[in-house]
A protein has these predicted regions:
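Primary mode marks residue(s) on the alpha4-beta5-alpha5 output face of response regulator receiver
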Residues: 27-171
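Bacterial N-terminal signal peptides that target proteins for export
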Residues: 2-14
């Protein structure tokens, strides 16, 4: 079953195992509502997180590893170096075309997280894998107010925290 979380509100959809976290608002709103800091400390060459930090949810980047984001209103995320125990890893991003906001279009595009991108990252198809997928997706507010068009595909091991990347895990 693919679930869908918004970055500020929980929304569930039905399909295999993906949770969509969608954005609502921009960094200024996050500051008002108590979101995390602007960004984590990162390696200048690789862009990888070098020190754990609670960051604004809009600062989450491809390759970031995070502690479980939970559900409900999400304004921030706890990013950690991938070498440390973590629950989630952003493994792919899907750029949506401009136009009117559509939950159906976002849900359909999110299916790309469990297709070829998943197989390329993990090494086996989603159907054969023991791993799950969540997505961080635009909400209506973030679409309209922050020009948010990116769906972030996030891989999760339902068995618990992992250390290191799940790239090539083949399970």
């Amino acid at each position: 079953m693919m679930k869908s979380r918004t970055r500020r509100a929980l929304v569930l959809t039905g399909t295999a195992v993906a949770v969509s976290l969608a954005l609502t608002g921009c960094s200024a709103i996050n500051s008002i509502l108590g979101g995390g800091r602007a960004d984590a400390d990162r390696d200048e060459e690789t862009g990888q997180v070098t020190e754990s930090a609670n960051v604004d949810v809009f600062s989450v980047k491809l390759g970031d590893c995070m502690l479980e984001t939970g559900s409900g209103m999400l304004t921030d995320a706890n990013v950690v170096p991938c070498s440390e125990p973590h629950d989630e890893e952003v493994f792919y991003e899907i750029k949506m075309d401009d136009g009117e906001y559509s939950e159906d279009a976002i849900s359909a595009a999110s299916e790309g997280c469990i297709g070829d991108a998943y197989t390329s990252f993990v090494g086996v198809s989603y159907q054969e894998s023991a791993l799950d997928v969540t997505t961080l997706s635009p909400s209506k507010d973030s679409w309209e107010q922050a020009n948010d068009r990116v769906i972030q595909c996030i891989i999760v091991d339902p068995a618990g925290q992992v250390e290191g990347s799940l790239k090539g895990a083949a399970r």
